[in-house]
Structures are given as C-alpha cells and as structure tokens.
C-alpha cells in the first residue's frame, strides 16, 4: 500500500449503521485484531482486552441489552465519557450531527416512537453478526484509555482494509452490569465500549452518512 492509498483508507472509514447477515470468518477477525494489537501503549503495557461475540452469544447479549433499554433502565457506565459541562462548540457539533442523521432517516424531532426505535438499534448492533466488547481493568486511568483508543482506531482501520464496516458504541457501555453478567466478565473489568462489525448493507441510506470534519485551521496551531 502506497502513501496515497493509506491516506485514502483513513478518509474512507466512517461509522456503518446497517449490516447484512453475511458471516465474518474468524480468520479475518484475528487478522484485524492482530493488526490492532500493534498499537502503541505506555511502557508497552497493552492494557486492552476484547471479548468477541458471535452466534448465540451475540444474540444473548443483544437480547439482554434490548430488555434493559425497553424497560427504560437508566444507563450507568463505568466511566464518564466527556467533560461536563461540554464546551458550547462541542455541543453545536453534536447537535448538527444528530440533526443531520435524523433528517437522513426521516425522523421528526417530535416522533418519540421513531427516536426510541433509533436508539434501540444500538442494542441490536445494527444487525451486525459480530459484536466486540473492549474492556480495561477497573480504576483504569486516562493513559490506559488513551492506549485503548489507539488500539480501537487500529482495529477499525484494519477492518476497513479487510472490506468490513464497524461502529464504535459507548451507548452499549451504559449497561455495563448487563454486559458483565451476560459474558461472565468479573466486576473488576470496566466496559469501555462495544464495536459492531460486519459487511455494510449497500442498500441502506444510513450508511452514506458521514458527519462534517473540522478544517485544519480549527484544530491545528502552527508555531515556529
């Protein structure tokens, strides 16, 4: 792969929110995970761990999460995702992203059932046949999350290179106790996020959605 092809791969990756039921082979998943494991980490600690679910276990996890969501259970993740209160410019971008996605899916702002169904898709993993759970030791610090983020980005890029789509999901981590109970993970594991993986559905309009990215001038400060 030449430099232009690699840069094109970086630009090509975006969240997929509709998948076919075509299976993903274990060999392909192992290749992607092996590439992800090349991520750097502080003092080579490699703190990340991944639980891969397919088949009946994937379905059991989805069913358990959907049951919590349908019951109106309040999400309670193991860690706070973002700075609070969030800077207004962050909120502006989040709102713009949400509005654009709902417009594409033809979901009106006051259509509560449609919004509820939209949220539920997170827990059906958008139909993906594979769902991975990324976890860290309880009490993990910011640097450990930095390492896990680099691992996750490597993984998503590897999946893209292998012709697969993915969608990272903090929403799933909101029901961390359910995940631990269903997958037999101990209480001393923090759930970082889920990752839905599969072959993107080429007929799904939602998969054309790519949110705007900031221009360099908005996030780079050159100093000489």
For the regions a protein language model found, what residue spans apply to each?
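Acidic, surface-exposed loops and disordered segments
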Residues: 1-224
